[in-house]
């Protein structure tokens, strides 16, 4: 690209940014203020260090999503950042040469993908519909093609910047930390949502977390796909961490990300995690055995098998402990096994073990008899003594002290014995006699682990790698066991066969709706056309609920269409707006309603809601008069009660919900002039007259998601892009995978990073077996950037460009 062309593109992007800034709906409280402050800060960062976009975009792509506040999901906040990135990046594109390049094969496949994308985009977009109030606020619009198509367009616009900035360690220095930052933000959002709504320990609820992904308002797997992409890089950070605080931070991030992944209750994501873990395990074993003589390789293989058997036994013991003693027993068992893992790496004075055990039992017996019985909570005997034993063991083995001598090791063995006794006591206290077998199994297995140093060589040593692996395993088991044993997870796995049959029927129905002509087979029906195709042509005769903005005599209003399903009741489509309420306050709700018959019925509620699944709702006492085709005004009191209570993070978001509920035949109801005021007269509803169409309003379909998603990545590609789209992206995937595998097999210095990238791609595709991930532009763009990073290679060998700096 010439300098003049780059500057011209920068000017166009800058002009588009200024126009988007002018029309973007600011003014939605603290989210808008944060976004308004972010834009100039990001601009200054790019002026200072142009390559910082490699950090900022991966960090902000998943979380910069204000659609539930603004109602805008065609032009998103991340689009403004991308316009700013292109404008600043292309203006300075030629200040230094590109450090990376693409192979001829990569250029060819990118060209083929671009041609397939362009054909699918035009087929979905043309003929251009009128640019009215419904053009950009629903998925039935032909302009939905632009919404889905922008991911590839952004990826191609960022490619020259990637070639310039990813080299010389730029990818490793900026992009990987950006991915980890984004993952930590998403995991934090998931943790807050889980704690705020169903509760962290409430695993029987069917509540589905969405974290910051507003695209999940009609279902889909945006969170699943993002976690599939991000988790391998969290593991990579843990594997490569050098300072202790890096290892601790990586382990904490992995724990948060694993919690978010497990709390989705997504079977597809679980399968993706298993596939990625299998790939990583195979690579680690091959690295471990590489270069060993045959005899040593056999010995190492036997030790690996023995380690796996031991890990399986520990998992079974933890499962038994959780089944008998619940969360507290599980936590105690995890602590015991962790302490045993560390203690077993020392040369224990076994000749003094009987004396240590006798002393421990005596101390434990005396303390248990003297401990007061009228205390509550963690001050109860088994819990407090367990904690004291753990602290004593930690002090005896504290790594900052000089090498452990006989006295300290005897003290550690005494503390370990007390820890084991208190574990059994916790089981008895919490679960009674049924908990004792699990506790006995855990103590016996921990005692066997203490014999680690008697093996030659031992199964593990106290090293950074073994500690990281043990910590990751402890976190995984501590999180996975309660989730897998929960009622909701059990129910999900029990219905897998039936759900798969339903998914197969949906896939067949999607294929049946596709026109049987050569052009559709080659180029697809067009990007983003599936929701409209399902609405008009599904073979079941169902009519999904819809929301549209109408205009009459210069006045705009919103029209809600109730669902019409042959089987009877259908899932409602809820029109939502976030409102700021004071608790225990009387409000007056006013609105104008028009309908022509007895149906549909209008539901008006104030609910605590993040995105999906409302809770603690207060319904407005609305009783509609018989429909006569004329506007009817209603004013009714509604009390906020508990809604709006709490401070800052403890205050759950409150949303006003409107939904049309009818019979098996779809019918419509019109709404206008919505108002919600307290005695002070301050209006709580923005755009209640709908003069700005869908601004400030969002919508959700909580349970029925099939009208919006094909639910398979490959099938989505075929239906919307045809064989050209499928084969071109398949070729690009194969090329990227082969390059990553080739670098790994050649002993590349960045081998673990290549395996992490390959595992992320694999996990994303596994999630895509059961969901369509390419209908969320921000996730699709992140996936494309990862693919492009895998295709890059150094422009020319130089002393300053080593293999380690080659993406990913």
Residue ranges and their predicted role:
Residues 2-20, 38-43, 86, 107-121, ...:
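Alpha-helical transmembrane segments of multi-pass inner-membrane proteins
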Residues 44-149, 356-371, 416-426, 764:
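N-terminal hydrophobic segments of proteins, predominantly signal-anchor/transmembrane helices
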Residues 59, 66-67, 712-721, 752-789:
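Membrane helix-loop boundary segments at the extracytoplasmic
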Residues 87, 592-642:
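Extracellular ligand-binding interfaces
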Residues 132-141, 201-218, 368-377, 505, ...:
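Juxtamembrane membrane-water interface segments that cap and precede transmembrane helices
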Residues 179, 591, 602-605, 633-679, ...:
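Extracellular beta-strand ligand-recognition surfaces/modules
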Residues 210, 215, 258, 542-583, ...:
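A conserved mid-to-late transmembrane alpha helix and its immediate loop/hinge
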Residues 505-551, 679-707, 711-717, 721-728:
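TM-adjacent membrane-interface loops and short helices in multi-pass inner/ER membrane proteins
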């Amino acid at each position: 690209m010439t300098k003049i062309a780059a500057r011209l593109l920068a000017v166009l992007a800058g002009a588009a940014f200024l126009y988007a800034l002018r029309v973007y709906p600011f003014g939605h409280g603290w989210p808008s203020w944060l976004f308004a402050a972010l834009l100039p800060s990001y601009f200054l960062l790019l002026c200072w260090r142009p390559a910082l976009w490699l950090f900022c975009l991966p960090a902000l792509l998943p979380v910069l999503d204000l659609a539930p506040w603004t109602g805008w999901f065609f032009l998103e906040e991340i689009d403004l950042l991308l316009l700013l990135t292109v404008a600043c990046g292309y203006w300075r594109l030629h200040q230094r040469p590109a450090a990376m390049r693409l192979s001829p094969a990569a250029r060819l496949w990118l060209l083929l993908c671009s041609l397939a994308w362009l054909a699918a985009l035009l087929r979905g977009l043309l003929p251009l519909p009128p640019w009215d109030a419904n053009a950009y606020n629903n998925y039935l619009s032909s302009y939905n093609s632009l919404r889905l198509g922008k991911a590839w367009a952004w990826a191609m616009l960022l490619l020259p910047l990637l070639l310039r900035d990813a080299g010389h360690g730029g990818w490793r220095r900026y992009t990987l930390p950006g991915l980890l930052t984004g993952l930590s933000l998403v995991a934090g959002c998931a943790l807050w949502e889980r704690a705020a709504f169903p509760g962290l320990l409430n695993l029987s609820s069917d509540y589905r977390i969405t974290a910051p992904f507003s695209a999940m308002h009609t279902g889909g797997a945006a969170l699943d796909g993002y976690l599939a992409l991000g988790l391998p890089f969290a593991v990579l950070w843990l594997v490569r961490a050098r300072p202790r605080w890096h290892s601790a931070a990586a382990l904490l991030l992995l724990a948060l990300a694993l919690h978010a992944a497990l709390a989705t209750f997504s079977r597809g994501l679980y399968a993706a995690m298993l596939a990625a873990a299998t790939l990583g395990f195979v690579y680690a074993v091959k690295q471990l055995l590489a270069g060993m003589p045959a005899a040593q390789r056999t010995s190492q293989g036997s030790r690996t098998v023995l380690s796996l058997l031991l890990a399986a036994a520990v998992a079974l013991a933890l499962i038994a402990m959780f089944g008998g003693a619940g969360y507290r027993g599980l936590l105690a068992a995890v602590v015991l096994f962790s302490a045993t893992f560390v203690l077993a790496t020392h040369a224990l004075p076994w000749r003094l073990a009987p004396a240590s055990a006798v002393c421990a039992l005596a101390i434990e017996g005396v303390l248990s008899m003297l401990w007061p019985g009228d205390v509550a909570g963690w001050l109860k005997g088994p819990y407090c003594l367990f904690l004291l034993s753990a602290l004593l063991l930690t002090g005896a083995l504290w790594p900052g002290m000089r090498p452990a001598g006989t006295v300290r090791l005897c003290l550690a063995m005494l503390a370990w014995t007390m820890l084991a006794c208190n574990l059994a006591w916790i089981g008895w206290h919490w679960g009674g006699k049924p908990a004792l077998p699990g506790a006995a199994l855990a103590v016996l297995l921990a005692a066997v682990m203490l014999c680690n140093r008697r093996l030659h060589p031992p199964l593990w040593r106290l090293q950074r790698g073994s500690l990281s692996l043990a910590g990751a395993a402890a976190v995984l088991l501590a999180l996975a066991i309660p989730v897998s044993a929960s009622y909701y997870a059990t129910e999900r796995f029990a219905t897998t066969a039936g759900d798969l049959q339903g998914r197969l029927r949906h896939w067949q129905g999607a294929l049946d709706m596709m026109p049987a002509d050569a052009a559709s087979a080659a180029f697809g029906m067009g990007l983003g056309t599936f929701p409209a195709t399902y609405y008009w042509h599904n073979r079941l005769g169902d009519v999904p609920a819809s929301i549209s903005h109408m205009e009459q005599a210069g006045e705009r209003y919103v029209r809600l269409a109730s669902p019409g399903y042959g089987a009877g009741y259908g899932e409602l489509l809820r029109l939502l707006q976030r409102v700021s309420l004071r608790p225990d306050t009387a409000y007056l709700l006013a609105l104008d309603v028009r309908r022509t018959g007895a149906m549909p019925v209008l539901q008006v509620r104030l609910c605590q809601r993040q995105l999906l699944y409302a809770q603690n709702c207060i319904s407005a006492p609305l009783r509609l008069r018989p429909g006569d085709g004329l506007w009817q005004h209603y004013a009714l009191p509604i009390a906020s009660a508990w809604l709006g209570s709490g401070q800052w993070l403890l205050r759950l978001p409150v949303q006003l919900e409107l939904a049309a509920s009818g019979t098996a035949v779809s019918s419509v109801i019109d709404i206008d002039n919505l108002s919600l005021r307290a005695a002070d007269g301050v209006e709580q509803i923005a755009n209640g007259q709908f003069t700005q169409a869908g601004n400030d309003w969002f919508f959700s379909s909580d349970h029925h998601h099939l009208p919006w998603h094909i639910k398979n990545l490959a099938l989505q590609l075929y239906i919307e892009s045809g064989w050209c789209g499928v084969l071109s992206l398949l070729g690009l995937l194969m090329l990227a995978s082969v390059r990553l595998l080739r670098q790994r097999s050649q002993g590349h210095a960045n081998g673990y990073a290549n395996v992490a990238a390959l595992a992320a791609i694999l996990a994303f595709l596994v999630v895509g077996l059961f969901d369509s991930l390419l209908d969320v532009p921000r996730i699709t763009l992140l996936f494309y950037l990862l693919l492009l990073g895998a295709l890059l290679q150094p422009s020319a060998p130089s002393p300053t460009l080593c293999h380690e700096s080659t993406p990913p």
